[in-house]
Amino acid sequence: MFFDKYYSLLEVKEISKICSKPYGFELLILIYFQTKNNADTGIEETYDKLMFNKSQRPAFINFINELEHRGIISRHISKTKKSKIVLRLSENLMNKINQILKINS
């Protein structure tokens, strides 16, 4: 069951791109829940939460920039601290994930 869902997620090209990095699936989960819960977790905090196969910080930021350029994620100013930038998955991608996982948003 888990693997069926995982493979279905990987068929989505945006998710496949995120998961192209060793830490990608973990990053996807983090940003998904940050988006879903409207969490005030900044880019640096997101990086620090990665536990497995973490890249160097500059490579991580370059990957975030690439995902943003492709429209997969977006950056938003934190509602609590103007100097903090939070990451969000695109609404379209959130809908695709929720549909595959059969989650009501």
Predicted regions, residues:
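Short amphipathic alpha-helical interaction segments
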Residues: 53-69
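Short acidic, hydrophobic short linear motifs in intrinsically disordered regions
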Residues: 37-50
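Short, cationic-aromatic polyanion-contact patches
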Residues: 78-101
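Short amphipathic alpha-helical elements of helix-turn-helix/winged-helix folds
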Residues: 30-37
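Short alpha-helical segments that sit at the start of domains
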Residues: 2-30
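A short, conserved structural fragment
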Residues: 68-78
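Amphipathic alpha-helical dimerization/coiled-coil segments
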Residues: 11, 98-105
